[in-house]
């Protein structure tokens, strides 16, 4: 696949097309990042990509499934039960798939190869900058969620190793704040400082194995529950329509693979919108099966008593669940640096454009700036993770932001793409597509505003 970069308007901002680190970071971990010549990267070039249709399905599924899986049983509880949770996901799936197809269409029309480049080219500079800022904030919040997940799983594993009863206070070295900090400084920080990402394939493998294993464990534990596990109240209907919307952040966070989808589309052997529609439909159906299996079985196992992280609801002594916790920790340890690289790349691009300095002119200070950016990012995410009690509070905020990537930006791209057409007489299909774009933007803005306001309101009352 062709080398990509974060900012596309090089002539205006004085940036070179050889953007070094930033040229590779906002791709899916599974996408080939080897640079090619301009001829090979062009639409008429002999090689449009190396990813097969089946491979693209796997990559999109891998990009979709992740840490949000742990919060789906709690989302079913919030939504008001199994029926409401299923209906909500099925309804959302139509918009999620259409957003992925719209991005591919706009990528093909604009000849851009990353999410933010497509938004920048189709919607203009202001929307492009907002998109980059949103990506930076989203990756920052996801990094916080990753550290909280590490602490959650370590608490359970340490309790078993130290043979401490649930909730009992142990020695200082088993304290949650200490164990999260130690793990972060020993493993995450060293992986985050380097300029290159050399462990992407391992992160992808661990993420896939861990996700499927967690799903299998949750389903098996529902079919053959342990005697000491008793479910709480099983809700059958939502308390209010607002309760259903409160489950939206988890679903948006879980299904958000749109940012990495554009590079995947351009890495395909046949990057055609029709083929891509089949790819994302198959991928989303697979992801839906995994999320629904985990959400339904986890919710029915524990009912309204389910934790925001479903693995915390299981006994510490359960060895099968302990293996799942170990998988999740390993997956998150390698996923945090990748998300951090993405966020750091966007911050770096925004900073250089603000300064009006090209990469080549500022290469002497690149390492010092990279280390400083990494340390500030790492310390802020760690500090917030130490004092935020569970991943549900983080997902409630960044899940609303994920709605912007799923609804708002694709909707704006569709509207702008259709408005740019020079037809004097607009056919009915033109009006339908523009109206659908308006619907996407309106729905996404509502979800973002409602969920973010609700998250802030709940946290202020807590």
Curated annotation (Swiss-Prot):
Please give the Gene Ontology molecular function terms for this protein: L-asparagine:sodium symporter activity; L-glutamine:sodium symporter activity
Task: Name its cellular compartments.
Answer: Lysosome membrane; Cell projection, Axon
Catalysed reactions, semicolon-separated: L-asparagine(in) + Na(+)(in) = L-asparagine(out) + Na(+)(out); L-glutamine(in) + Na(+)(in) = L-glutamine(out) + Na(+)(out)
- The answer on whether this UniProt entry bears the keyword Transmembrane helix reads yes
Q: How does it sit in the membrane?
A: Multi-pass membrane protein
Which family does the UniProt entry place this protein in? Belongs to the amino acid/polyamine transporter 2 family.
Q: What is this protein called?
A: Sodium-coupled neutral amino acid transporter 7
User: Which organism's genome codes for this protein?
Assistant: Pongo abelii
Taxonomy of origin reads: Eukaryota, Metazoa, Chordata, Craniata, Vertebrata
């Amino acid at each position: 696949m062709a080398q990509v970069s974060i900012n596309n308007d090089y002539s205006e901002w004085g940036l070179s097309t050889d953007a070094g680190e930033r040229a590779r970071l906002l791709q899916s971990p599974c996408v080939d990042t080897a640079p090619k010549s301009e001829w090979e990267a062009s639409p008429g070039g002999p090689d449009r990509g190396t990813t097969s249709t089946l491979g693209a399905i796997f990559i999109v599924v891998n990009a979709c499934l992740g840490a949000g899986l742990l919060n789906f049983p709690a989302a079913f509880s919030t939504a008001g039960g199994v029926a409401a949770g299923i209906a909500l996901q099925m309804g959302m799936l139509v918009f999620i798939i259409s957003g992925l197809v719209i991005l591919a269409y706009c990528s093909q029309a604009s000849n851009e190869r990353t999410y933010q480049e497509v938004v920048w080219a189709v919607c203009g500079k202001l929307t492009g900058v907002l998109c980059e800022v949103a990506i930076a904030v989203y990756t920052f919040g996801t990094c916080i969620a990753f550290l909280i997940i590490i602490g959650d799983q370590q608490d359970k594993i340490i309790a078993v190793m130290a043979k401490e009863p649930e909730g009992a206070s142990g020695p200082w070295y088993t304290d949650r704040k200490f164990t999260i900090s130690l793990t972060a400084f020993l493993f995450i920080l060293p992986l985050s400082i380097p300029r290159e990402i050399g462990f992407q394939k391992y992160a992808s493998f661990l993420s896939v194995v861990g996700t499927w294993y967690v799903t299998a464990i949750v389903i098996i534990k529902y079919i053959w529950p342990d005697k000491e596990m008793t479910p709480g109240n099983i809700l059958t209907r939502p308390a209010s329509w607002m309760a259903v919307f409160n489950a939206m952040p988890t679903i948006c966070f879980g299904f958000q693979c749109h940012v990495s989808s554009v590079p995947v589309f351009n890495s395909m052997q046949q990057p055609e919108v029709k083929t891509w529609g089949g790819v994302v439909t198959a991928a989303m159906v697979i992801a839906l099966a995994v999320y629904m299996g985990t959400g339904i079985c986890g919710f029915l196992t524990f009912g309204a008593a389910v934790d925001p992280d479903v693995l915390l609801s299981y006994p510490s002594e359960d060895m099968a669940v302990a293996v799942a916790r170990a998988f999740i920790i390993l997956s998150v340890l390698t996923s945090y640096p990748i998300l951090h690289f993405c966020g750091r790349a966007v911050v770096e691009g925004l900073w250089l454009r603000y300064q009006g300095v090209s990469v080549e002119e500022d290469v002497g200070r690149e390492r010092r700036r990279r280390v400083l950016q990494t340390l500030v990012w790492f310390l802020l995410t760690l500090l917030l993770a130490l004092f935020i009690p569970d991943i549900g509070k983080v997902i409630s905020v960044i899940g609303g932001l994920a709605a912007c990537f799923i609804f708002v930006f694709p909707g704006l791209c569709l509207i702008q793409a259709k408005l740019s057409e020079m037809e004097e007489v607009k056919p009915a299909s033109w009006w339908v597509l523009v109206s659908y774009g308006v619907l996407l933007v309106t729905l996404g803005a509502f979800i973002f505003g409602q969920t973010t306001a609700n998250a802030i309101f709940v946290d202020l009352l807590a």
